[in-house]
């Protein structure tokens, strides 16, 4: 009974992981598509996402995360067993952490640019761009918000891969040679 329950739990965990590996793929593609098409022209001139270095970084980061999502999804689907080896668990943990930080920096960069675009900064002569380029700002905001949703997915993946990796280790030995079992409440 315990083995069937454990196997069912592992299968459910794998399905949950697959969901969080496919979701950021769709979100990254959506964020990239919105930003790549983002441009607006008016009497003040033309504005394109590529005119803003931080938005280019956002597109690149979403592209890298989308590629990683495809590869990690394929790796998860094509894996022969439910359990990961030590090496694979470490690799997934490190890559999940790295991509989480990558998309975090891209999202924060986008948020900062949007704050400057909406609020301006008179000390550095940055005017409120969104007053004149409303459509551009709305599309950029949508892309940044979707990128932040990608961040949440990658945070969950980081937690899952950390749990998968560190649950492979024994509990530490404490006083008098007794093991501490943290799995019981």
Curated annotation (Swiss-Prot):
GO cellular component, one term: plasma membrane
Taxonomic lineage from the root: Eukaryota, Viridiplantae, Streptophyta, Embryophyta, Tracheophyta
Location relative to the cell: Cell membrane
Keyword Cell membrane: yes
InterPro entries according to UniProt: CASP/CASPL (IPR006459), CASP_dom (IPR006702)
Residue ranges that the UniProt entry lists as topological domain Extracellular: 37-57, 112-141
Transmembrane regions: 16-36, 58-78, 91-111, 142-162
Cytoplasmic side: 1-15, 79-90, 163-185
Pfam family, one: CASP_dom
Membrane topology: Multi-pass membrane protein
Protein name (Swiss-Prot/TrEMBL): CASP-like protein 2A1
Subunit annotation: Homodimer and heterodimers.
Originating species: Picea sitchensis (Sitka spruce)
Key words, A-Z: Cell membrane, Membrane, Transmembrane, Transmembrane helix
Similarity annotation: Belongs to the Casparian strip membrane proteins (CASP) family.
Location (main, coarse): membrane
